């Protein structure tokens, strides 16, 4: 049996479990802060600006260093980078748990982001080394994808349960035993792999430019979404795009490039990257609305709403299994197309939500979306990894993760901004006429502001304001669902037109082993 078609055994699947666990935690640490903020705010008393940095420091540094860490793993060894990052992540988590000031918590969250940036590209690249059979690798990547997505879902649940019995720092301590397990089992189960010809030296300037580009663009998107178009957001976006252009120019010119620009010349690499960003754009962007619907319209607690979101996670293995089983028979492009169309059907279901719709309507529609996206994400990531040479798998996986980060940031910014504009426009014409200017401004700002304002009004006026706010919010939710459906259908059409497998590749129906790939 050739090495390319060698099937994985118990050792490889156990190694996959070891790889998935830290990624679950890295994803959890992004979402767990939503339920932790009230408790730590009382204890540490951060300012408004400090509170934002407590939330953002982790995600910003993680996104900004993905490309650097993926390339570093290709050069010095993926297992080495992973285990070093795991040790640093555990140490930073310990410091965060006992942070005694907002500044200390911000610093430790930043350290966690730096360490967390080693996890995704290293684990994905190691999956490429562990699984050589196409179908098994697609399944393994799907399990990894479900773990990463599932961490964001279970984070608020785990956080809520811990905070009922322990102090806020306990949400960070759960990272330590998992990282310790990785440090113990990783050397035994995970193979080491590095580029045999990494070049003479590491491109430090390129790493700095990539960091500035990603951080500045994401910060500019976030600032523009929160405060509207202004000098800070526009300046940050301009600086990020300039740094990005300089980074790409340097990658073409230097012999020690972090990424091989010629990868982008093949449709089997650039189209899946775009699909990854589009799917994340829609799913992450729409999450702004489904959480508000559960907590503000239906009146659920954060823990209860997180529990109701579990079906969207539990259905992911089904989507992954279906995608992995269908890909060898009908081809990866058709599986991705079908997954996007299934997700679009779920978004269409979300356009039918009304203020009096129950939780089952929302959960069923979101579960359909999750079913489709799970299969797409697994196959898309596998296609991206397969399009790159094995010695560049770390850089390829980091680009896949970076595209997803950008997609999520853009989804929140663009869908959030459009939704806010729709909500304010409708509230401006439908809010009760007897509100004071201050009350009207609060009610027009957000749904939460309208609900808080309603608590200060007489019963009749409060009911009228709540109804107007609910109607305005449902309208913005429906528009976000329509846009998400259009994007996913557009992605399906793009795949159908651009990714046409060669008829001779009946076993894989994906990118050919060498044709169209960039040289090492």
Spans of model-derived segments:
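Transmembrane core module of solute transporters
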Residues: 16-61, 167, 232-235, 243, ...
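Transmembrane alpha-helical cores of Major Facilitator Superfamily
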Residues: 24, 56-60, 87, 142-150, ...
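C-terminal module of multi-pass small-molecule transporters
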Residues: 17, 77-86, 102-103, 119-123, ...
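Transmembrane-helix exit segments and adjacent C-terminal regions of multi-pass membrane proteins
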Residues: 2-17, 21, 27, 382, ...
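Helix-loop-helix hairpins in multi-pass membrane proteins, especially solute transporters
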Residues: 71-205
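MFS 12-TM fold signature
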Residues: 62, 88-96, 112, 178-182, ...
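Interfacial helix-cap and linker-helix signal at transmembrane-aqueous boundaries
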Residues: 40-41, 72-73, 158-166, 221, ...
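Hydrophobic transmembrane-helix bundles of small-molecule transporters
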Residues: 142, 164-282, 289, 300-302, ...
């Amino acid at each position: 049996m050739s090495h390319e078609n060698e099937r994985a055994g118990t050792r490889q699947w156990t190694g996959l479990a070891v790889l998935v666990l830290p990624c679950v935690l890295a994803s959890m640490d992004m979402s767990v802060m939503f339920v932790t903020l009230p408790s730590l705010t009382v204890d540490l008393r951060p300012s408004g600006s400090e509170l934002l940095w407590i939330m953002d420091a982790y995600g910003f540094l993680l996104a900004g260093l993905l490309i650097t860490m993926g390339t570093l793993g290709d050069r010095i060894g993926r297992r080495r980078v992973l285990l070093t990052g795991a040790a640093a992540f555990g140490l930073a988590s310990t410091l965060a748990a006992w942070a005694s000031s907002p500044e200390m918590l911000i610093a430790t969250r930043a350290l966690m982001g730096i360490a967390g940036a080693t996890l995704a590209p290293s684990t994905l690249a190691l999956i490429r080394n562990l699984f050589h059979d196409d179908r098994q690798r697609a399944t393994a990547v799907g399990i990894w994808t479900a773990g990463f997505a599932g961490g964001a879902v279970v984070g608020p649940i785990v956080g809520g349960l811990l905070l009922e019995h322990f102090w806020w720092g306990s949400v960070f301590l759960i990272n330590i035993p998992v990282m310790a397990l990785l440090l113990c089992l990783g050397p035994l189960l995970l193979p080491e792999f590095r580029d045999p010809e990494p070049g003479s030296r590491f491109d430090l300037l390129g790493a700095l430019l990539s960091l500035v580009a990603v951080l500045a663009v994401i910060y500019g998107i976030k600032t523009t979404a929160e405060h509207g178009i202004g000098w800070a957001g526009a300046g940050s976006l301009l600086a990020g795009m300039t740094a990005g252009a300089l980074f790409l120019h340097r990658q073409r010119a230097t012999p020690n490039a972090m990424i091989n620009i010629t990868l982008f010349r093949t449709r089997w690499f650039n189209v899946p990257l775009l699909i990854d960003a589009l799917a994340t754009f829609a799913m992450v962007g729409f999450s702004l609305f489904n959480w508000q619907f559960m907590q503000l319209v239906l009146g659920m607690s954060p823990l209860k709403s997180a529990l109701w979101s579990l079906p969207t996670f539990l259905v992911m293995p089904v989507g992954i299994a279906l995608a992995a089983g269908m890909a060898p028979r009908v081809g990866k492009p058709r599986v991705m197309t079908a997954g996007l169309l299934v997700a679009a059907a779920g978004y269409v279901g979300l356009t039918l939500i009304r203020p009096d719709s129950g939780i089952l309507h929302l959960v069923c529609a979101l579960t359909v979306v999750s079913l489709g996206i799970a299969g797409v994400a697994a196959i898309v990531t596998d296609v991206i990894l397969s399009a790159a040479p094995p010695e560049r798998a770390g850089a390829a996986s980091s680009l896949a993760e970076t595209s997803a980060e950008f997609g999520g940031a853009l989804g929140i910014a663009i869908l959030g901004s459009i939704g806010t504009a729709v909500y304010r426009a409708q509230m401006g014409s439908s809010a009760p006429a007897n509100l004071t200017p201050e009350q009207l401004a609060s009610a027009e700002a957000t749904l939460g502001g309208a609900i808080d304002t309603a608590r200060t009004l007489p019963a009749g006026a409060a009911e009228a304001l709540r109804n107007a706010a609910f109607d305005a919010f449902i309208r913005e939710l429906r528009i976000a669902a329509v846009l998400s459906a259009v994007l996913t259908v557009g992605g399906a059409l793009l795949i159908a037109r651009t990714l046409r497998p060669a008829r001779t590749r009946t076993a894989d129906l994906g990118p050919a082993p060498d044709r169209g790939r960039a040289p090492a």
